[in-house]
Design a protein with these regions (language model features):
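Short, glycine-biased loop/turn motifs at secondary-structure junctions and
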Residues: 1-372
C-alpha cells in the first residue's frame, strides 16, 4: 500500500491561531513587533485564568479606575459568581446603582491611548504593533466573550427574542470585560499609565459593571477547556464553568446540551443513527470515532487502491459522511505509522480522488509522496 506523507502527528494536529500577522516589513513595524513578541505570555495567561479572583487587588483597581476618570469611588463593590449572576442582580436589585460609567472608566482612556500610539507609530506602525500584540489574542478571546454573552441570554431569556432578551443584551454591553480585555490592553504600556487600573482588574478578576454608585464584579471561571484551535471543547462536563454553576457545554466549538454530553460515554451505532439533529449526530460520530463506527456497523469499503481506502457512512436526513483511510508515511517517534481518516466530499468515488482533493488536486494529477 502506498503511504502518503502528511507530516508528523504534531504537524497534523496544528496549533492555535489567534490573530493576524502584520502586513509589510517596514522598519517601524519590525521594531515594534520584535519588542512585543516576547511579552504576550502574561496577557494570554490572564485572559484564560481560572480560579478565585484576588478581590482586594481587583477592588483597588476598580477604585483607581474611577479616580483616574475623575469620578468619586463607588460607594459599594458587590461580588457575584458569574456574568449571569451579575445580570440577574442588576435586573432584580441595585435600583440605586446610578448611571453606567463604563465610557468614562474604560472607553475614554482606551481611545486616548490608542490615538496617542497611532499618532506616534503611524498607520503602518500601528497595524504591525496590533498584529504583534493584541491581534494575536483577539480572535480566541472574542469568541469566548461572544459565547458567554449568548449563554447568559439563553439561560435567562430562553427562546425569547423580544424585550427581555434586549434588556439582558444591554446590561451585558454595560460590562467591562476584566480578564477578557487582555487583548487590547496588551497593546499598550501597562505600568503607571492611564490604563494601569484596568490592567489590575484584568489580572485579578472577571467581568465587571461600573455604575455611578455601585460596582459589580464577577468571579473568574473555575474551569476552561479548549481545543488546539482555541474553541470551547470538553466531552466530560462543562467546557466553561463558573463557581455559581453557570456553565457552557461544547464539543469542538459547537454548543451542546449538558445532558447530551452525559450520554456520549454510552454511545452505540444505533443511538448515533437514531439522532435526528444532524449537527449533534456529527458530534457523536467524532466522539465515537469514525473508524470505530465503521467497524461496529459492519461497513464495507467503497473503493480501495494504493493511496488508501474509501469509506461511506449513510445518515438519515443528512448527506453521507465519506472518508479516506490513509497511512501516514512519516513515522511516529516509536517507529509506528499513524492511520488518518480524511473527510472528503460525498461525491468522491475513489480513494485516490479523495486524497487528491485534500491537496487541491485532480485525481490524475496526484502522485503519492512515498511508497513502502
Amino acid at each position: 500500500m502506498t503511504t502518503t506523507d502528511f507530516g508528523s502527528a504534531t504537524d497534523m494536529e496544528g496549533t492555535e491561531v489567534t490573530g493576524t500577522e502584520a502586513a509589510g516589513t517596514d522598519a517601524a513595524g519590525t521594531e515594534v513587533e520584535n519588542m512585543a513578541t516576547g511579552e504576550l505570555g502574561p496577557w494570554r495567561a490572564w485572559a484564560s485564568a481560572t480560579g478565585p479572583a484576588d478581590r482586594a487587588a481587583a477592588e483597588a483597581g476598580v477604585r483607581r479606575a474611577y479616580r483616574l476618570a475623575g469620578l468619586p469611588e463607588p460607594e459599594r463593590v458587590v461580588w457575584v459568581g458569574s456574568p449571569r449572576a451579575a445580570v440577574t442582580l442588576l435586573r432584580e436589585d441595585l435600583a440605586d446603582r446610578g448611571a453606567s460609567v463604563r465610557d468614562a472608566v474604560r472607553s475614554a482612556p482606551w481611545a486616548r491611548q490608542r490615538r496617542s500610539l497611532y499618532t506616534e507609530l503611524g498607520a503602518a506602525g500601528w497595524s504591525a504593533h496590533w498584529a504583534a500584540t493584541g491581534g494575536r489574542l483577539w480572535e480566541s478571546t472574542q469568541a469566548l466573550v461572544d459565547r458567554i454573552r449568548t449563554g447568559v441570554i439563553e439561560d435567562l431569556a430562553g427562546r425569547d427574542t423580544g424585550k427581555e432578551a434586549a434588556e439582558i443584551r444591554l446590561l451585558l454591553l454595560d460590562a467591562v470585560l476584566g480578564q477578557h480585555d487582555a487583548p487590547w490592553l496588551a497593546a499598550f504600556p501597562a505600568d503607571d499609565g492611564p490604563l494601569d487600573a484596568l490592567t489590575a482588574v484584568c489580572r485579578h478578576a472577571g467581568w465587571w459593571w461600573p455604575y455611578a454608585r455601585v460596582a459589580v464584579l464577577s468571579e473568574r471561571p473555575v474551569a476552561l477547556h479548549r481545543d488546539e484551535a482555541g474553541r470551547l471543547d470538553h466531552g466530560d462536563g462543562p467546557a466553561l464553568a463558573y463557581p455559581d454553576a453557570f456553565a457552557l457545554h461544547a464539543w469542538r466549538g459547537m454548543p451542546v446540551p449538558a445532558e447530551f454530553l452525559a450520554g456520549l460515554a454510552t454511545l452505540t451505532p444505533e443511538r448515533i443513527r437514531a439522532e435526528e439533529n444532524a449537527e449533534l449526530r456529527r458530534v457523536m460520530l467524532e466522539y465515537y470515532g469514525y473508524d470505530r463506527y465503521l467497524t461496529d456497523s459492519g461497513a464495507r469499503p467503497l473503493h480501495q487502491d494504493e493511496t488508501g481506502t474509501l469509506w461511506r457512512i449513510d445518515l438519515v436526513d443528512d448527506e453521507p459522511v465519506v472518508m479516506v483511510e490513509v497511512l501516514n508515511s512519516t513515522p511516529e517517534p516509536d517507529g509506528t505509522r499513524r492511520t488518518y481518516w480524511l473527510r472528503v466530499p460525498p461525491s468522491t468515488r475513489t480513494a485516490r480522488a479523495g486524497v487528491a482533493w485534500t491537496f487541491g488536486l485532480a485525481a490524475e494529477a496526484y502522485a503519492p509522496a512515498a511508497e513502502t
